[in-house]
Amino acid sequence: MKIKLLLTILLLAEIITANAQNAEKEYLKKVLTNLEKIESATYYVTNESWQPGDSTALSTLHSFIKEYDNPMDSTIGASYVSLDANDTTKLEFCYDGNIRVLPYHENKKLAIDDFTFRPLPFRLVSPPFFNHAKNIIRYALTTKDHIATELKDEGDNYYFKLVIDENQQVEFFGKAYHMPLPPFDIGSTTSIYELWINKSNDLPYKKRREMLHDISVSTCSNLAINRHTIYDFNASDYFPKDYEIVKYSDLYKKKAEPTASSLIGKKAPGWILENIEAQPVSLADCKSKIILINLSLIHISEPTRRS
């Protein structure tokens, strides 16, 4: 009798768990469908960057985003422009599916990157909010990776958590990418993504990404959707008229540096350094024909500095 009761309880528990999982999956499918219906979106976003263990954000940026679904783009499947939230005529970043545009306001230059300089296996383009959220949910519903998910009712919104337990960290540049491991041990490779979904429209309004080395949080407001299409988007419309347009690769062209052989016989420039007693020593004070200079560099990492 007791065994039958125990088996009944276990069976009921399995049924309840299965029903909850099915309900979670069906709701995520609904949210994904809503995200896939977005052809364009404008919104304000606050982006925060954190270091794990810190109590305050390392940086906080406020932007106004115009995001467009772009099926022709094979990288992230979207194009977008990021503008200063306090001055929406001031360009911060732009990606149209072919190029990315990086403004350098201090010297009035626009760097155009066509991704031919230092090409990578995929374009490192940070996706806009709704494109990112869409690909996170699609991955959660379809992946064969080792994941755990949670969907929780929090009153006015649902909280969704995705934990990816793989041997490599997973980032989303459009689709999910398992990032190559560095040559040193990074510790945990767990990737965590969290979404807060508004019940009023079944769309995410906040997302959080956590890796061992970095945490980022994005929060949207003043959302307007489907008032434009990708055909209304032209990156050059956001170029400041008085800025010089340069190639991104030109920013990294180094001037020819003198070789050691070309310095032989040349007069050394004057300099002043400190000796091991922290006393200043100048070149003019040195009378020897040959001088040995020993330079030491001490690097203090963030964890050491905090401690």
PLM region spans:
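N-terminal leader/targeting segments and the immediate start of mature chains
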Residues: 19-69, 142-149
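Single conserved hydrophobic/aromatic residue that forms the stacking wall/gate
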Residues: 298-307
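Beta-turn initiation residues at beta-strand->coil junctions
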Residues: 47-49, 82, 103-107, 208-212
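An acidic-aromatic
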Residues: 71-130
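Non-transmembrane domains of secretory- and envelope-associated proteins
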Residues: 184-191, 200-279, 286
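Conserved helix-turn-beta segment immediately C-terminal to the redox Cys motif
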Residues: 289-290, 305
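Extended beta-strand-rich segments in extracellular/periplasmic secretory proteins, especially
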Residues: 130-200, 279
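Bacterial Sec-dependent N-terminal signal peptides
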Residues: 1-26
